[in-house]
């Protein structure tokens, strides 16, 4: 159960980083 919580927090952190970069710059990753 602890590993599941760790993966969930890690996913949230990566998603936050991705959205921060995506909204800071014009989306260049899709192309």
Curated annotation (Swiss-Prot):
In its UniProt entry, the species of origin is given as Synechococcus sp. (strain WH7803)
| Family of the protein in this entry | Belongs to the PsbT family.
What are the record's GO terms for cellular component? photosystem II reaction center; plasma membrane-derived thylakoid membrane
- Name recorded for this polypeptide: Photosystem II reaction center protein T
Keywords noted in UniProt: Membrane, Photosynthesis, Photosystem II, Thylakoid, Transmembrane, Transmembrane helix
Tell me the SUPFAM superfamilies matching this sequence.
Answer: Photosystem II reaction center protein T, PsbT
How does the record classify its membrane topology? Single-pass membrane protein
Q: Tell me, in one coarse class, where this protein mainly resides.
A: membrane
* Quaternary data: PSII is composed of 1 copy each of membrane proteins PsbA, PsbB, PsbC, PsbD, PsbE, PsbF, PsbH, PsbI, PsbJ, PsbK, PsbL, PsbM, PsbT, PsbX, PsbY, PsbZ, Psb30/Ycf12, peripheral proteins PsbO, CyanoQ (PsbQ), PsbU, PsbV and a large number of cofactors. It forms dimeric complexes.
Query: Which ranges does the record mark as transmembrane?
Result: 3-23
What top-level branch of life does the organism fall under? Bacteria
Gene Ontology BP annotations: photosynthesis
What is the role of this chain?
A: Found at the monomer-monomer interface of the photosystem II (PS II) dimer, plays a role in assembly and dimerization of PSII. PSII is a light-driven water plastoquinone oxidoreductase, using light energy to abstract electrons from H(2)O, generating a proton gradient subsequently used for ATP formation.
Q: Where in the cell is it found?
A: Cellular thylakoid membrane
Checking InterPro entries in the record gives: PSII_PsbT, PSII_PsbT_sf
């Amino acid at each position: 159960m602890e590993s599941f919580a760790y993966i969930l927090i890690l996913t949230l952190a990566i998603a936050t980083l991705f959205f921060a970069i995506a909204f800071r710059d014009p989306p260049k990753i899709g192309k």
